[in-house]
Each structure stands twice: as structure tokens, then as C-alpha cells.
Amino acid sequence: MSDKTRFETGLAMLNQIDGKGGQQVVETLQEIAPDFGKYLIEFPFGDIYSRKGADLKTREIATIAALAALGNARPQLKIHLRACLNVGCSRTEITEILMQMAVYAGFPTALNALFAAKEVFEEAGEEAKAK
């Protein structure tokens, strides 16, 4: 796949998953590291998320579990929590996934992830009311 096609595929995938949230990250990177924004579109979204072996819901579940377990990626976790809602995960599913992380990543890590989810759920609720 050509770089242009990778970028176009990645951008379309990002918009499908995350709408404006991911695009804002890329735009912010234009000021400091435009190439990194390009890589962020091409590799994860153009190459990996666009693969046929797993649907977007499954990919986002894996992503929020990994980001929660890392324990140091709160902004990215919040973006992917929103994306998880966008691709069909319920709040209950998300909560259960994050609670599961207590077993493997510890209670503080799971607690922090649950607090991030609470913020995302509240923001999503406010946006729904505004429509």
C-alpha cells in the first residue's frame, strides 16, 4: 500500500472510530511534530485498525485494556474510551473491562481508569443532552 493510501485509509478509519477527537491530536502535532501525526494515522489506523481479522469493537476493547494497564496514558485512554462508545461498547462493558484490569494491573490502575471512564461518560451524557 502506498504512503498516500495508508494515510487516506488511516484517516478514514480514525474518523470512523473517533470523529473529531483523534483529528484534534493530529492537528495539535502539526505545530511540533507533523511527521509524528502522519505516522499516527498511517501505522495504527492505516495498517492495524483497518485489518480484517477483528472488528472495531474488539480492537477498541483491546486498546482500552492496554492503555488502562499502562497506567500512564490517561489522555489516550480517554480518547479510546470515547471511541469504544462510538463503535458500540456499552458503559457496562467498558466498566467491566476496566474492573478486570485490577486483577492484572492492580487496583490503583483500575481505579484511575474507572475515574477516566466516569469523566468520558459524563461528557458523552452532556453532549447527548445538548443535541
Regions found by a protein language model. Name each.
Residues 1-57, 111-131:
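Acidic, glycine/proline-rich low-complexity segments that act as flexible tails and inter-domain linkers
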Residues 13, 44, 79-80, 96-97:
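A general alpha-helix detector
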Residues 32-44, 72, 76-79, 85-86:
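Acidic-glycine-rich active-site phosphate/pyrophosphate-binding loop
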Residues 58-67, 97-98:
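Short, structured motif recognition centered on aromatic/hydrophobic residues
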Residues 66-73, 106:
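Short alpha-helix boundary/capping elements
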Residues 73-95, 109-120:
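Extended intrinsically disordered, low-complexity coil regions enriched in Ser, Thr, Gly, Ala
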Residues 83, 99-102:
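Hydrophobic alpha-helical segments of small multi-pass membrane proteins
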Residues 102-108:
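C-terminal structural segments of small proteins and small subunits
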